[in-house]
Every structure is written in C-alpha cells, then in structure tokens.
C-alpha cells in the first residue's frame, strides 16, 4: 500500500507551512552543489506498508521516505530539507518504543551504506571479504534487522542523498563540524516533534565521521533538553589529532594491532596465532610497552629502532623489516602496497585484495570499489520501486565537494577532537549508554586507536566496547553481523552486564610530535569523481593535527566544564533574511 503524507509540525511552524503552500506545484529537484539551496522547504513523503519476519515473529511496519525541514532554535527559520527514510513498527507505544537515527560520515557521505548494508529491513548481500558475489548484489529481507528493538530513521547529511539547504542558506553553510552537528540536532528535534516522538527513548548510530558527529550531536541534544538514551559508535575516529594516518608526526601505535590482525589473516605472522582475540591482546601489550616509547623516540629525536624491536614487529605483523626500518612510524599506505608485493589490500577491509593495476585496484581501495556500484544502483531502485518515492534519480551517495570544502576545525583545533563532547554528554546524562563497535581488519579507523581515545574517559559503567572479524563496515561480514546484532539487542534492552568488562588501556605519555606535524601525503590513488569516498578522509592541505597531547583527567574535566557553560551550544549563523518554509 502506498500513499503520500505530510508530517505534522507543531504550532507556528505548521501555520507557516500551510500559509505558504502552493497547491499543485511540482516537486523540486534536490541539488547537492556547494552553493545550492531550495527557495522554500518541501516536505511531501511516500508511505508504504510492509511486513518483516524476525525470529519467527511477523513485524508489520510503515516505511516513510521524504523530506523534513530542520528548523533553527528560534522556531521559525528553516535551515535544510533533510531526506530521510523511517521504518516504524505498527501498533507500538511511542512512549516506550526507541527511535534510532542512523547516518554515515565522510564527511560527504550519504547514509546508503548503513541503510542497505547493516540493520535495515532490506540488505544487500555482498559476500565480503570474498569478491565473488555476482553484481549487482541481491537485495534481501534482513534477519538481523533492528526493527524488533527500535524504530529506524536513516538520514542523509546536507548536500548528500537528496538533502539540501533552504535559502538563504546554501549547502556549503552546513559543511563543517559544528554547523553539521547543529543542523542534525535541529532535524532530530523536528522529526520527534512532527511524529510526536518526544517521549520515545532516543538513540544515535553514527559510522566513521559519523562518530565525531555523534559525540557533538549528543552533547547538543542534551543541552537542548533531548538527552539520548544511548549512542552507537561504529568504526570510530573520535579524535582526528591522534589518528596516525592524519599526519607524519602522529604516532601510528593505534594501527599496530590492526596490522597484526591483517598479517594473521594472510598467514604472515610468526608463529601463526591460534586464538585471534588472545593474540591481539598480546599485541596491544607489546605495542604499549615496546613500540610506543620507541616510536616517540623516533619522532622526537630520530632515534633508530632497535633491531630486536624490528624483528618482533615483523613477527607479529608479517610486514617486512625494511619497511619498519625505513619508517618506524609506519602509516597504512605503505602497508597496503607492501604487505603482499604486487597486491593492493583494502583500506576499508584489509581482507579484500586485488592485483596492482587491476580494475578492482584502480580507485585505491578494492574493498570499496567492489561494493560501491551495487549500492549506488540499489538505493535509487529501492526508493522508487519498494518505497514509492518517485524522485530518487538524483540521489547522491557521496559528495567530493563537501569533503573538499569541509571545515574540520572544532574547539580551537584544526582537526576535531570530540572526546570532550562525548564526556560532556555523559556529564549531562550519566545514564547515557555508549556502545563502540570496531572491525579487527579496518585500516581506516583502527580498533586499538578507538580504545586509546575512549580510555581518556576513564572507567565508565555504561560504556561497552566490542570487536569483530571484519573491516570498516563490520556488518557486511555474514559471520560478524549476527554477533553485532546480538550485542546491539543487549544494548537496547540494557540487559545486566551488557557493557562487559572492557578495561581502558593505559594512556601513553605523549602521542604527537612537539612541533606541528607534517601533513600526511595523498592516498596512493585519489578517489575518482563519483567513485568510492575515503571515510574518514581529510584533504592533505587540511591535515594539521594539534601538537598538544590529548586531554584526560583534570584537563578533560576542565574542557567539559567550559562546554557546559555554553549551555545552548552552537547555532548556525543566518546569512540573511529569507522566507518561511513552504509545504506543498
């Protein structure tokens, strides 16, 4: 069953929309360029009825695909027409039923990867890490769908998918850490109001750059009186300044356990590990005790590595001693090209590889090139044919312009460190549940670096940390996805002991080079226009990690205090007078 509906907005906003309604005017196009905007907001949506069987139980649900206007905190000013797809189980009590907002990162990525790859009602079968699945991938009912735990809302950032600014704003006005999080806050608030879900338990689910967005957004929502019940951090990069791929002077200690996991997958570690989890625990300990102080000496004083250390690194990672001797602070680029000579291994999922010079290697990441065309084709067809949304042909899965134009600055740093934002959200809402999910074979957001970042929070009773075999998009792995679903189910239910017994690693004394770090070079191959987007990716000219060590303890508490003093959070400066939103 299909129908067209108009979400109900409260009070003065609803009256403004009705007053400006233009009757039978045609739907606008949704341009995604930097200067693009709509003259007025547009909020028509398609509604379709479906049923999904999960665990033997039939769940009838309604899918809504369309646009909803983010309204500024003044309650009058339209900012952006967000495209979203919501899945709502029928017949549930909205006061008890959770609602979860999903988004990817980039920055400049739509939500297509989470939408059609993870825990929605329908899922593309990729077969990764194998690359033998015929393309385009089949779209199937998803037995790991989260509709048995929560209603689901997939949201595209402004300038991606079909989301676009409303004049006088342009898309570019929302392409920055703070402006992006603020307009997401305003969308969440608009969605909850339009659907009368203000009392529903609120959850956020961000992936990659979506994790720093989640940290900032959670803090802003708490300040706005809409505290989330929980946040999910999939493949985190919470502090860009501590990620060794962002600058030549930033320690790559966070990558070493991932290198070990990748070496084990290819049978290069000596001796071959029996239990991967136990082995990686040993590698973490070795990294903290031996590698980290050595690489700091290498970075600050040029102290050459001890041959015994190089031998141990070769044994636990399979990476040739020559690479470690050449640069002890070994970034993932040389590992991806040098681990298996003549072969390029994936950045998103290092278990995926392709011969150098092959079509699969031509865009710089075979694990991304393999899946991107199918996702790009599937989302348009799915929106049009399954969800009855007629204007999906212009759906943009990623925006290189957004990534190139992005303002990465945040809290006085050129690159964002959002651990203080997450800490501020926890301070405002001590019951906030946080679930961190990482893949062992992800060379974009390494799992041990996530641990080091989260360790700055200290022991947190409501923080769960989980690792799986898999890459950046763990959920594409058919073995790991059911495990991830089980962990998410326990998270939503707040089952006793759901957080587990994760012990934060000890923080190193210093993680970065004293002078400003030299920007890391370009990736081996720059993504082609319309091709796979590196996520997280920072253009080389903007890779200026802070020389200051990450805050923890008293210094972190002081940062949190300053954030809480700014209770309202950042708003988006309005460029000039503009019309009220128009509903047609």
Name what the model sees in each region:
Residues 297-444, 456:
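Alpha/beta-hydrolase fold catalytic core
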Residues 197-208:
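Alpha/beta-hydrolase fold nucleophile elbow
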Residues 30-34, 69, 76-173:
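N-terminal cap/lid subdomain of alpha/beta-hydrolase-fold enzymes
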Residues 458-473:
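Catalytic histidine neighborhood in serine/cysteine hydrolases
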Residues 121-125, 219-312:
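A catalytic-pocket lid/entrance helix-loop region that shapes and gates access to the active site
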Residues 507-584:
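Long, low-complexity repeat tracts used as extracellular stalks/passenger repeats
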Residues 147, 157, 174-192:
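Alpha/beta-hydrolase active-site loop
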Residues 471-481:
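Catalytic histidine-centered segment of alpha/beta-hydrolase-like enzymes
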